[in-house]
Amino acid sequence: MSSRSIVFMGTPEFACPTLQALIDRGERLLAVVTQPDRPKGRGHKLMPPPVKELALAHDIPVLQPHRVRASAFVESIRQLAPELIVVVAFGQILPKALLDIPPLGCVNVHASLLPRYRGAAPLNWCIINGETETGVTTMLMDTGLDTGPMLLKRSTPIDENEDIVSLHDRMASLGAELLAETLDGLREGRIEPQPQNDSLSCYAPLLKKEHGLIDWQRPARQIHNQVRGLAAWPGAQTLLNGHALKLFRTRVADGAGAPGTVLCSTGGQLEVACLDGSLLIQELQLAGKKRLDSASFLAGCPIAEGTLLGGAATERPIP
């Protein structure tokens, strides 16, 4: 099977399995384009994106433009003359001048069943909204936000207790598999691009810290979904005696009481009332402390039954 000349564009860990799949297939990777190194941690040390580290480990040239719309960058890609550009969670909108360069087009791997959940955080919002199924779509890119013609789709169920960390890893692998299948299908002429139905679309906007603020005046299931969907970042949080308390793992229960009230804090269990039902908090973290299971947390930080969690600062609904 003849290889294609490809420029790969991606940034986070999610994109790494797809890049690795291209390497393993023997595709001719002319360059990898990724976001600039960013300061991280308390020391604000510049850290390379995961995709950059993988590319350098395989001696693939790396480009890190601050703006992909810059004419100098577009010209550098034109000089490489790729047959195809593959994009996975790159992080910038590509201009038409760049999209027009490869004769075979630009193929994007998007982590949703398009046209639903276009945008920056599809997996998180799928979970937050209580979806029971999601998937991956490959598409030919146009100048819109995830609006191009679809190539292939692969669906997968979401368990009611699965969080974003688990789903992210599964979908990253699924995306790599689907991209390989897509490239084979395009090479063999087996794929007919399908237009998206815009009337069925919805958007998954970039996450903000305020999306993590818990409003206990909501049903337990909705708060549970919020915890699952934000477990990686920013974390769902409330207040305990004025201190930020992040929740990482919960289960829905059928307790009743005033929303935000601690119903049970004995036997290693921490149960909090919601508008409809209650939550069993199984893993949590107080500001400045370690992330712990509920039994370990309560052993070091007892919470009296009847304690009210939250307050004016946290009682804001998720948009």
From Swiss-Prot:
GO function term, MF aspect, one: methionyl-tRNA formyltransferase activity
Gene Ontology CC annotations of this record: cytosol
EC top class named in words: transferase
Keywords: Protein biosynthesis, Transferase
Known EC number: 2.1.2.9
Domain of life: Bacteria
Catalytic activity: L-methionyl-tRNA(fMet) + (6R)-10-formyltetrahydrofolate = N-formyl-L-methionyl-tRNA(fMet) + (6S)-5,6,7,8-tetrahydrofolate + H(+)
Residues reported in the UniProt entry to bind (6S)-5,6,7,8-tetrahydrofolate: S112, L113, L114, P115
Family assignment from sequence similarity: Belongs to the Fmt family.
Role, per record: Attaches a formyl group to the free amino group of methionyl-tRNA(fMet). The formyl group appears to play a dual role in the initiator identity of N-formylmethionyl-tRNA by promoting its recognition by IF2 and preventing the misappropriation of this tRNA by the elongation apparatus.
Family annotation (PANTHER family): METHIONYL-TRNA FORMYLTRANSFERASE, METHIONYL-TRNA FORMYLTRANSFERASE, MITOCHONDRIAL
Protein name in the entry: Methionyl-tRNA formyltransferase
Organism per entry: Pelobacter propionicus (strain DSM 2379 / NBRC 103807 / OttBd1)
